[in-house]
Design a protein with these regions (language model features):
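Solvent-exposed residues in well-ordered beta-strands and their adjoining turns
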Residues: 108-110, 166, 179-181, 206
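Conserved phosphate/anionic-ligand binding catalytic regions in large, soluble enzymes, centered on
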Residues: 171-184
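N-terminal lobe of the biotin/lipoate ligase/transferase fold
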Residues: 1-141, 145-157, 167, 211-212
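C-terminal accessory segment of soluble enzyme catalytic cores
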Residues: 148, 185-235
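Histidine/acidic-rich helix-loop-helix segments that form or flank divalent-metal centers
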Residues: 160-163
Length: 235
């Protein structure tokens, strides 16, 4: 059973978190490459990380994203104090704001599964199971990534968790953002994930709650991650 170290960076600027992710990601890849030149009994075990954090208001555009899905100007971004980054993950545009639970699994998939689609579907299952604990029925939308509420109803389908990753040499980075207590105001200024005519939602909105316990929900995510990835978490 692989071990995954849990890290919690709290509220952190996106650029700083991205750099810290890259450091862990590169460390794992470099170790894998070094192992190639060593006999099996001398190879080093590659690390795995599950990073939790939140970000100040930030828009990120993935490798398949279109700039026109950002509906405001650079000047408006500056006036609102919102950061914008073109990033090296898959997917289109999304929004990070305080009140989300952002999770970055930095994993060597050789410990888990060498199948990107299966990895993504398993990440979605972690969130689907977590939401079930809070009485929220969630699932997938055909031909779309992430976790959705009422995906079977075209007029009511709404995204509650966005996902986008990078993977090289079977090492992953980036991850997902689960909407919990956050405002949805900033989502009005983008075409979320590049999908038109679909809205976003939060756990609070679905449960008609003023606020929800972030740390408690993190524990649920950890539990389901450990079960679904057959991993031992270390904190």
């Amino acid at each position: 059973m692989p071990t995954v170290q849990v890290l919690d960076w709290g509220l952190i600027d996106y650029a700083q978190a991205w750099q810290q992710q890259e450091t862990l990601y590169r460390k794992t890849i470099d170790l894998k490459l070094a192992n190639r030149d060593l006999p099996p009994n001398e190879q080093h075990l590659t690390p795995n990380y599950l990073v939790f954090c939140e970000h100040p208001p930030t828009y990120t555009l993935g490798t398949s994203g279109k700039y026109e899905h950002l509906l405001i100007t650079p000047k408006q971004l500056e006036e609102q104090g919102v950061a914008f980054y073109k990033v090296n993950r898959g997917g289109d545009i999304t929004c990070h704001v305080p009140g989300q639970i952002v999770v970055y699994p930095i994993l060597d998939l050789h410990h888990f599964m060498t199948d990107i689609s299966r990895f993504m579907r398993t990440c979605e299952e972690v969130i689907i199971h977590t939401l079930q604990e809070y009485g929220i029925a969630a699932s997938r939308l055909a031909d779309a990534t992430g976790v959705w509420i009422e995906p079977q109803n075209p007029k009511q389908a709404r995204k509650i968790c966005a996902m986008g990753i990078r993977c090289s040499r079977w090492v992953t980075m980036h991850g997902w953002a689960l909407n919990v207590n956050n405002s949805l105001h900033f989502f009005d200024q983008i075409v979320p994930c590049g999908i038109k005519n679909k809205t976003v939602t939060t756990m609070c909105q679905e449960l008609k709650a003023d606020t929800l316990p972030i740390n408690e929900i993190k524990q649920s995510i950890k539990k389901h991650f450990a079960l679904l990835f057959n991993a031992q978490l270390s904190e």
